[in-house]
Amino acid sequence: MVKGRKSQKADKVTKAKKRVADEVDESESEPELQVEGLIDAEAESEDDESFESAEENASAEEDEEDEEDEEDSDAELNKLLAEEEGDDSESEYNTSDFSEDDTKSMTDKLSGVKLTTIAEPIIKTKFSDGTPRVIKPEINPVYDSDDSDIESKNTIGNIPLSVYDEMPHIGYDVNGKRIMRPARASALDQLLDTIELPEGWTGLLDKESGASLNISKEELELISKIQRNEQTDESTNPYEPLIDWFTRHEEVMPLSAAPEPKRRFVPSKNEAKRIMKIVKAIREGRIIPPKKMKELREKEKSEDFNYDLWGDSTETNDHIMNLRAPKLPPPTNEESYNPPAEYLPTEEEIKEWENTEYSERERNFVPKKYDSLRKVPGYTESVRERFERSLDLYLAPRMRKNKLNIDPESLIPELPSPKDLRPFPIRCSTIYSGHEGKIRTLSIDPTGIWLATGSDDGSVRIWEILTGREVYRVQLVNKEDNPEDNIHSVEWNPDGSVGILAVAVGNNIFLIVPPIFGYDIENAGKVRIEHGFGYDTFGSTKKANLEVNGSDLESDDEAANANTAVKKQVAQWHKPTQRQMEQDICIVIVCKKPVKKLSWHRKGDYFVTVQPDSGNTSVLIHQLSKHLTQSPFRKSKGIIMDAKFHPFKPQLFVCSQRYVRIYDLSQQVLVKKLLPGARWLSNIDIHPRGDNLIASSYDKRVLWHDLDLAATPYKTLRYHDKAVRSTTFHKKLPLFCSAADDGFIHIFHATVYDDMMKNPMIVPLKKLTGHKVQGHLGVLDTIWHPKEAWLFSAGADNTARMWTT
C-alpha cells in the first residue's frame, strides 16, 4: 500500500510538469491571449527558480510524509482513500453548457499552479557616513491608494461564492471575462496541510481568486506586535527626550493678562428667564416642588377616603387647556310669548327687518304676542342657532379671564372728610370790578388790608379788601402811545413798615409808595428807596462776585480777565420825573427786555425779575438798599418762565420751560435739578417750610415735588381741562390752589409732616367757579390772604374776586 501511494504521488508530480509545459505551448500557440509585457525574463527566471525550489520542497515533504505514512495503520489509509473518492464525486460539475475538452484543458492547466506575489524591489543607498539607507517607494496619492477602497478584481458583489461551486469559474472581472477556479488539492493533501501548517496558512479562502489566503512574514510580525502592544512603526522612537510642557513649578505671572469678561460676574439673563418661567409655573401650580409633592402623597396615604354612595358626584378639576363653553344669555322680554306692547314692532319695522340681510339683523326673530303658551309654534331658527354656536365654539378662539374680586372702596385711598379740614374758601364774597381790561396780576399787602391789581388797561388799582372799595388808582401805561406795554406783575414788599409796591410795566420796574398808609409808613418807604442813591458808582462798578455758574467760563484766562472787567449795565436805576413823582413813583428801573415776573425776598431788600427774551440776563437780582442790579448767570439755560427765593435759605429757584433748577447763592453752585416731566411750565411756588414745591404747566397738570425725595414729581394732579396759569401756597395754613384757563379754581389741603418717613397728604377740597372764560383765557392769577383762609383771584373777565369760608 505504501509503495502504491508513492507511485501515485510520483504520477501527480509528472502530471503537474506536463500541465505546465502544455500551458506554455498553448500560450505560444493561442494568438488570442496577449501576454506581452506582463511577464518579463527576470520574472520567468524567478518563476523557474521558485518552481525548482517548490520541487525540492515537494520531494523533501514526500520523504517526510513517507516516513510518517509508514507508521499509519491500514484502516486509517482506507478511510482517507474513501474521503478522497467522496471529494472526487462531489467535484463533478454540470458541464452541459461547456465542452468536455475545454473543461479538461482548463482544469489541467490550473491544477498544480501556485500563485505568488512579486514584491517591489527595495532600493538601498548609503548615507554620507556610509550607513545603508532604505528608500521606500513613493506613495501615489490617488484614489486607489486607500486599501479600504481597492477595486475588487472579482466583481460579483455580495453574491456568495457557494453559488459558483458547480461551475469552473468563480466570477467575472471588470472586463466581463471569467475568473477560472484554481486547482484544488486532494483530500489527502488538505489533511496534510492541516497537520503540517504551511508558512502563512490561515485556513481562509480568497473571495477574488478562490485560493487559500496566506499572510506574509511582515504581516504576521505586525499582528504579533499588535498583540504584544508594541510599536508597529520602527521609525518611531518611543523613548524620545521628554519635553516638560507643564512643570511642577507654580507660575507666578498669568499666561494672559486679559481682564475678566463681564459675563463671569454678571447674572445670566437667559438663566433668569428660565428661572422666572419655573417660578411662574410653580405659582400657577403646574410644577409642584418635591417637598410639597411628598407632603401631598403622605397626606393622601394618611387620609381615609369614606365615599358617600348616595351623594352627588364630585367635580373633577378640568385640565388647564380645557375651557368650558360660555353660557347662553338668558331670554329677554322680547322673547316672551306675551311681551309688553312696547316690545312689539310696527309693520314698518317688520318690513325693514325682512329687507335687512340675515347677518346684519340685530335679532333673528320678530317678537309676537300669543294668548297662551300652547299656541306658540316651533322656533324655526333653532337649528341654525345651534349650528352657528357650534361653529363659534370650535372655530373662534377663547381665553380665560380671571376676574379680580376687589372691593372698589379698597382702591380709593382713605382720605379725611373735607368737613374735618375746614376752614377753606367755598364761596365768592366780594367782586372787585372797575378795570377795563384783563386783570393779569394781583397782590395783597403784608397787613392783609389792601389788594393791588394790575390790568391790561394800563392802570394799577388798590382796593380795600373788606368793603371792595377802590382807594387808589394810577395810570402807568398810555395805551394810545404804548399799546404793546402791559402790566405783568404787581408785588407788595413783604416788609409791612415801608408800604412799597413794585410794578413791572414793559421794560420798566416802578417802585411806588401809595398814599394810603399814613405819614410814618410812607416816609419810611421813601427814605428806604432814596437811601440807595448814596451807593451810586456812576457806571464804574466792577463785576460782582455773584456768579452762580462761574464754572461755565471757557478758560482760566477768561476768568482772570472777568474779575477785573467793568460790569456791563444790565439795568439802570433812574430818579422819577416830575410827572412820575406826582403818581407817587419813587424810582424807575429800566431793563433791556419786558419784565414778566417779579418776586421779593422775605426781608424786603432784594427782589428778582424774569425777562424771558433777554437771553443770559433773563434773571436779574435787584438790591433796593444799594440800587444795584446783578445778573447771576453767565449763560442762559433755556427760556426762563419764573424765579423765586427760598423762604429762609439763600437759594434761588429758577423755572425754565422743562426744568426747575435750585441754586445756592452763598456757595454759587447748582444744588438740584428737578424734572417735572411737563412740556411747558408756567409758574412755581415754594412751601413755607421750604421742602416742597408745586409747579403748574400749560399742558393741564399740577406737579408736586418733594425736595427731599427724587427729582421727579411726588404727585401729578390732572384736574383741569386747559392750561394751568397759577399755583400758590398759603403762608400759614395747609392749603394751596390751582387756577386754569377753564375758569375753575381747585382748592387742596396739603399737610406736610415733621416725620420724614411720612409723605405729604394731599386732599382735594373744593372746586370754585365764577370767572368767565373770554378769549380762551380764564383765571390768570391767584394769591392767598396772609392770615385768613381767603383766596383772591384775577380773571380775564376784567374782575377780581375774593373767596371766603
From Swiss-Prot:
One Gene Ontology term, aspect cellular component: preribosome, large subunit precursor
WD repeat intervals: 434-473, 482-522, 590-632, 635-673, 676-715, 719-758, 775-805
GO molecular function, one term: large ribosomal subunit rRNA binding
Residues covered by region (Disordered): 1-105
Residue ranges, annotated region (Required for interaction with YTM1): 382-418
Entry keyword set: Nucleus, Repeat, Ribosome biogenesis, rRNA processing, WD repeat
SUPFAM superfamilies attached to this UniProt entry: WD40 repeat-like
Domain of life: Eukaryota
Comp. bias (Basic and acidic residues): 8-22
First and last residue of the signal peptide: none
Localization per record: Nucleus, Nucleolus; Nucleus, Nucleoplasm
Pfam families: BOP1NT, WD40
HAMAP family: BOP1
Quaternary structure annotation from Swiss-Prot or TrEMBL: Component of the NOP7 complex, composed of ERB1, NOP7 and YTM1. The complex is held together by ERB1, which interacts with NOP7 via its N-terminal domain and with YTM1 via a high-affinity interaction between the seven-bladed beta-propeller domains of the 2 proteins. The NOP7 complex associates with the 66S pre-ribosome.
Name of this chain's protein: Ribosome biogenesis protein ERB1
Organism (species): Candida glabrata (strain ATCC 2001 / BCRC 20586 / JCM 3761 / NBRC 0622 / NRRL Y-65 / CBS 138)
Lineage of the species this protein comes from: Eukaryota, Fungi, Dikarya, Ascomycota, Saccharomycotina
Record gene name: ERB1
